[in-house]
Amino acid sequence: MVTLKADEISNIIRERIEQYNREVKIVNTGTVLQVGDGIARIYGLDEVMAGELVEFEEGTIGIALNLESNNVGVVLMGDGLMIQEGSSVKATGKIAQIPVSEAYLGRVINALANPIDGRGKISASESRLIESPAPGIISRRSVYEPLQTGLIAIDSMIPIGRGQRELIIGDRQTGKTAVATDTILNQEGQNVICVYVAIGQKASSVAQVVTSLQERGAMEYTIVVAETADSPATLQYLAPYTGAALAEYFMYREQHTLIIYDDLSKQAQAYRQMSLLLRRPPGREAYPGDVFYLHSRLLERAAKLSSQLGEGSMTALPIVETQSGDVSAYIPTNVISITDGQIFLSADLFNAGIRPAINVGISVSRVGSAAQIKAMKQVAGKLKLELAQFAELEAFAQFSSDLDKATQNQLARGQRLRELLKQSQSAPLTVEEQIMTIYTGTNGYLDGLEIGQVRKFLVQLRTYLKTNKPQFQEIISSTKTLTNEAESVLKEGIQEQLERFLLQEKL
């Protein structure tokens, strides 16, 4: 039998006492009182912060939104089917944040930045708060560089600049998403990173957008954030902020970004649902009182940064759906007042075959020609004026049968200009092609053609000038101006192609 000496025992005890580490963990916990409809009411959690993440016993995460005197209203970031009444909840001490990195490019993720495209995990070393403050006045500079959409009607008359917020508004099925996706396609080779946020849409619609971007190689510079119609309201409400956080990551790294929110009406509806279930008082159209703040704090994050911060930019194209053209409803008026202009898509124009169905009369860009190259300013002014006069004359001509020759000519010119603005989906044009197209129309070269021949002629003209007069594109891209030399090359090219075209049509 081994005998232990007393001093050995005391040494062992001393060592153990020295190794003892007194660690006290204070956890702020509470108990579930009630759960249902994506909302949980928690008793306890006395020191929880507004917007703090809380974790339920079975692993679901929630956000503490309502801090009341006797309980806390938590919105769930999941279905919460396994949460039981009386189970415990603990505060995490964290606010919602997502991992960010270049590896997100080309991926489809959800509002929590988890991949949903079945292509494995995304590696990220940094993270950003989902809700971070917008850049201040000193951090910004005014918008001065163009962001080309590839659509003649927009780039000439409603120009968008890098760092601008331009609302796309219209009824359902008027081509709002098509305008947004065309803009993404047109950013190829422009060093612009695109983020497309789909909120409360059909999964089939999102899949269609992703497929069209993949087919044209646009997913290489695009991130898709999707929360479909079957997602919890909390995640639909968070999705735009997740997209903004990803775009901000690139903006602060001196890059240009474009973010599309498709659409903010659905986000407002999700927020209304959450607010009513949390028993917040309803306001106009049953939306809560802070629905304006919901959108303003999101859209204010779009900016053109100052030269000290690297001149990165984040351009936002929010989409809002109207009911039978009513732009005076609550959400449309809110977003119109926050943004720097709106592109109004009309169902009547869409049904009349004018696509993109942009109503140029009430669409406006408040940044205006500051975001256009000089060559575009030179040709776009005349186009705007002629179309405005045509719209006025067309309304007048309906009541009068005997019109003088000058009026008839102006109406004929207007019809051809309207034809010139029509474009197929997913066929964006370069700025040089747009300039030559507008110049052809405003200088009367299309007046001798039948309306049905206009688009065919313009397609052939663009091909002819690209192959036979490459110097025109070179002058425009290098000087950004329609110089006398460029104009004479263009005139020559149009004359040659017009003669060839008329000859072909006669045969």
Swiss-Prot record:
It holds the Pfam family ATP-synt_ab_N. ATP binds at residues 170-177. Keywords: ATP synthesis, ATP-binding, CF(1), Chloroplast, Hydrogen ion transport, Ion transport, Membrane, Nucleotide-binding, Phosphoprotein, Plastid, Thylakoid, Translocase, Transport. Gene3D superfamilies: 2.40.30.20, ATP synthase alpha/beta chain, C-terminal domain, P-loop containing nucleotide triphosphate hydrolases. The modification Phosphothreonine is found at residue 257. One of its GO terms (molecular function) is proton-transporting ATP synthase activity, rotational mechanism. InterPro entries: ATP_synth_asu-like_sf, ATP_synth_asu_C, ATP_synth_asu_C_sf, ATP_synth_F1_a_nt-bd_dom, ATP_synth_F1_asu, ATPase_a/bsu_AS, ATPase_F1/V1/A1_a/bsu_N, ATPase_F1/V1/A1_a/bsu_N_sf. GO terms for cellular component: chloroplast thylakoid membrane; proton-transporting ATP synthase complex. It catalyses: ATP + H2O + 4 H(+)(in) = ADP + phosphate + 5 H(+)(out). It is a peripheral membrane protein. Its EC number is 7.1.2.2. Transmembrane segments: none annotated. The keyword Coiled coil does not apply. The record marks 363 as: Required for activity. It is found in: Plastid, Chloroplast thylakoid membrane. The keyword Acetylation does not apply. Produces ATP from ADP in the presence of a proton gradient across the membrane. The alpha chain is a regulatory subunit. F-type ATPases have 2 components, CF(1) - the catalytic core - and CF(0) - the membrane proton channel. CF(1) has five subunits: alpha(3), beta(3), gamma(1), delta(1), epsilon(1). CF(0) has four main subunits: a, b, b' and c. Belongs to the ATPase alpha/beta chains family. This is ATP synthase subunit alpha, chloroplastic. It comes from Aethionema cordifolium (Lebanon stonecress).
